[in-house]
């Protein structure tokens, strides 16, 4: 699957014939943010600041001490910092790490794409084995950024099932990093919005579309990788992406709409529709 004017890139190292991102000394491929991301981010930050101000005022009213009042939001930030640190520690302690000697073909893909996106530092990459989650993830702690790949991307023999699909999913997560979605202060500044039903989720969906824009800008031929989220590594080749994308337009119902408004990731049908028709932005709300 390729868009109009898509760049033809050299073969991905280790995968003859597959696309990869431009080298670090070449022009960085631009990718637009979803138009709803910036306004939703502003609203979410505003809501968080209002909640923080209300909390500070409540503590000051109860204690009469500005020291205690200031300590509460500082404690929230400190706890969140520690939670991120523990999540990162869990990956380091339990997960398989992609390296030049361990899944080297995946490592080369990550390095190439990170350079093409202009990242000054290549994120660490881990493989999540088992569990119910088929999605890949991007996160961070301190100055470190890391990606988590699902074992659904690998076959029983340990080889990558589909190099182009993996490259697209890696580019999606690197897009989160390039767009600043994994930063500590950005996440802290929007914590309050997560307490408002639908608000934090709407920002999260917009960020997912932004990450897809990055992935499509670098690996347009791998956009069919969205089928893996729907069918997993074993069934995705049998999924008709066009049929699923059409359902984003034809499926109706209040419960379905409510679901789309509350989830943090775009539904598979809406995401596939956005990837198939690049003339339209992904649907965040209606």
Residue ranges and their predicted role:
Residues 129-146:
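Catalytic zinc-binding patch centered on the HExxH motif and its immediate surroundings
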Residues 96, 155-156, 192-203:
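Short helix/strand-bridging catalytic loops that position acidic/His residues to coordinate divalent metals
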Residues 1-132:
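Hydrophobic or amphipathic, alpha-helical segments that drive membrane association/targeting
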Residues 157, 170-178, 210, 214:
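Active-site His/Glu-centered metal-binding helix of metallohydrolases
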Residues 102-108, 112-121, 197-251, 277-281:
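Short helix/loop segments within enzyme catalytic domains
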Residues 173-190, 220-223:
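Catalytic Zn2+-binding segment of zinc metalloproteases
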Residues 249-286:
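Pan-zinc metallopeptidase signature
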Residues 152-168:
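Short pre-active-site segment immediately N-terminal to the catalytic Zn-binding motif
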């Amino acid at each position: 699957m390729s868009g109009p004017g898509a760049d033809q890139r050299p073969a991905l190292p280790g995968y003859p014939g597959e696309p990869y991102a431009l080298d670090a000394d070449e022009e960085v491929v631009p990718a637009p943010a979803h138009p709803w991301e910036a306004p939703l981010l502003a609203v979410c930050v505003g809501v968080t600041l209002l909640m923080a101000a209300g909390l500070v005022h409540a503590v000051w009213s109860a204690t009469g001490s500005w020291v205690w009042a200031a300590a509460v939001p500082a404690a929230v930030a400190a706890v969140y910092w520690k939670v991120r640190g523990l999540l990162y520690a869990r990956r380091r302690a339990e997960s398989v790490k992609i390296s030049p000697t361990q899944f080297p073909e995946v490592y080369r893909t990550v390095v190439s794409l990170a350079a093409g996106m202009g990242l000054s530092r290549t994120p660490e990459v881990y493989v999540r084995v088992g569990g119910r989650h088929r999605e890949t993830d991007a996160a961070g702690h301190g100055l470190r950024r890391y990606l988590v790949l699902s074992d659904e991307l690998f076959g029983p023999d340990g080889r990558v099932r589909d190099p182009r699909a993996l490259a697209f999913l890696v580019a999606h997560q690197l897009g989160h990093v390039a767009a600043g979605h994994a930063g500590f202060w950005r996440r802290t500044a929007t914590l309050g919005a997560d307490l408002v039903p639908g608000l934090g989720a709407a920002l999260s969906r917009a960020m997912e579309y932004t990450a897809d824009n990055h992935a499509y800008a670098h690996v347009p031929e791998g956009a069919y990788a969205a089928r893996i989220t729907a069918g997993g590594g074993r069934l995705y080749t049998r999924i008709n992406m066009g049929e699923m994308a059409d359902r984003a337009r034809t499926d109706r119902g209040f419960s379905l709409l409510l679901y789309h408004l509350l989830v943090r990731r775009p539904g598979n049908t809406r995401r596939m529709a956005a990837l198939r028709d690049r003339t339209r932005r992904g649907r965040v709300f209606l």
